[in-house]
Amino acid sequence: MIGMGADYSFGYRLDPPRRRERLHVDALTEFVRSQLCNLLDIIVPCNGEAEIKVDGFKFLGPDGGVHGLYADRGHSGERSRDSGGNGSGAGAAYGNLANAALYEPRIDYIARQLRDILDLVDLESDGGPVAIDGFRLKNHEDWASSRVANPSDILLHASSSCDLNCVFCYNRDTIDSLAWRRRSPDEELGELEARLSCYNARAGRGLFPSYGSPYEFLSNPHALRILRELRRKTPAAFRICTNGTRLNESTIAQLEELSPVYLEVSLNSSSPARRAMLMGDNQPGTAIGSLALLRRYGVPYSVTVVLWPVPSLEEALDDLAMTAAYAEDNLAALVQVNLPGYTRRSFPQPPFDTGTVWGRTVDYVRGLRERGACPVVIRPSLYEENVTRDRKNVPEVIGTVVNSPAARCGLERGDVIIAVNGILVANRAQARDLLSILQDNGTGGKTLTVKRGGRLLELEIRPGDRRYPFTPGTGTHLGAVFLGTGFREGNLGRMRDILLARRPREALLLSSTLVKPTLEQMLEENPLYIPGGTKLHIGVPENNSLGGNIILGDLLLVQDFIDFIKRYLGSVNGKIDLILIPSSPFYLSGWGRDLSGRPYLDIEREVKIPVELIECDPMWD
């Protein structure tokens, strides 16, 4: 790529110096206080290996008194969140500082420090003051790190535009940290060149992410050029989400040349009229017809349907059946049915009754599975498990990808995996892990022991026995499909380690509506994970920040945790010694921050009770 991004600038806006509202405040003390607070949002001080909690400071000079860091400062995580103007990066091609606070908070730290400095001093050039309204990163390589999970993440930085207008689009009115400033294709290409120049696929090293909530990558006219350049860097599979509007034969043929490529096609309906109604697609035939072309060129894909209940729920379900059948006829790997979600920002009033729509959709999809060979999965899968299964976390197969090793060995819907190659399976997460090991390293015949209708059967599975649409580069778990990832028992082991180290009498574990039933079952079956002398309470915060019908725990914000804990403490007269929170709501950042870019450390600062994170992966499906 010409230039390889050397001239691309990652720049960020600074607001003008603030007017001091509280004249009685000691400006220099406030300056140091703010500088320390900024720093303590990105580091944890240590003495040797021991972490140190800092809540104040004192000067070495005449004023030797102790100054508190967080007293009377409101929501400490919101102290300087306005350092980037409106946060969206609008105007003059500035980046989104709210997004930087999420993905690379050292940039936000620089902005906050500069703003504090410019509140006190003017910078000069040639003897005169200089008005500073922004800054840019100097050496791109200085900002490279080992946080690039997969090459597909790089593509999302060229996804600020979309050519459709879906009624259920979650990008409308999203929070500042995930909001996109729509950019020209050439500007996106410049950023991609910079990112590719710093990308080391073997080391998993590259520039910090900043894609927020992406739109449609293939709408960028440089998309195929970008893919070709990325393919020179890595042989890894490209997973691309697309609305299908650009999937003509020429594009699909070029994607096949770049294999392995896997497409998640947001089709939503095989009916031209319904697709046009839901997505604003003036040429729905392109996306609908792309499924046959993908099959012809051997590009594996799945179909996504958001079950939006218009004009009625029954009509939406009938259309789902036709769409699933159409996907199966064209050898889709699977059909993913997303239970419709919305936030308070996008729909101030509920557009439908969630309990009715979600429950009826689950029942309908279970019936579809009995009639077709293509797996149909519900997202979030834990909802289906909670309303249809008494036993949670069972390694039950709900389908197999057509022509996959799992399908060709005779594995059937309803089978429960008991052992993989002689290794006993305790839960769903373990079954998936063992199947992944076989897929990555297996040769020749292996054995699956399954329970089917009360009988134990032994199946011989051959990892190499597969045809389209299953490919080892894009398929998972040898083609077996489950009710989601499952709960890892190791999470409870890490919780026990914390409880043993802390020895609280009363601990509060915060969970989610979806995970709590599985968590309670596992603790009931394994009570030794709670040490003697500790009483464990389980609470479920509501997502008041996003509102709507959002119940995924990983979408909770720091303020949701704070609000719930304060209410809970009021109900138990403050008798809690330790608060435990899964780390997954802060996973995306990599810096212990929620989706708004606020550090989880603010929870303890606000509620004045020790908070520990239980390290765990998100339970993505």
Describe the function of each predicted region.
Residues 202-209, 285-379:
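Conserved C-terminal portion of the radical SAM core fold
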Residues 495-558, 562:
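Redox- and metal-dependent alpha/beta enzyme cores, enriched for Fe-S-associated oxidoreductases
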Residues 541-602:
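Cofactor-cradling patches in redox/metallo enzymes
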Residues 153, 173-187, 199-220, 227-248, ...:
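Core AdoMet radical
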Residues 242-243, 509-515, 582-585, 589, ...:
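Structural motif
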Residues 382-419, 423-426:
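PDZ/PDZ-like domain segments forming the peptide/carboxylate-binding groove
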Residues 364-373, 379, 383-387, 433-475:
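PDZ-domain C-terminal substructure recognizer with occasional recognition of PDZ-binding tails
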Residues 127-131, 141-187:
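Canonical Radical SAM [4Fe-4S] cluster-binding loop centered on the CxxxCxxC motif
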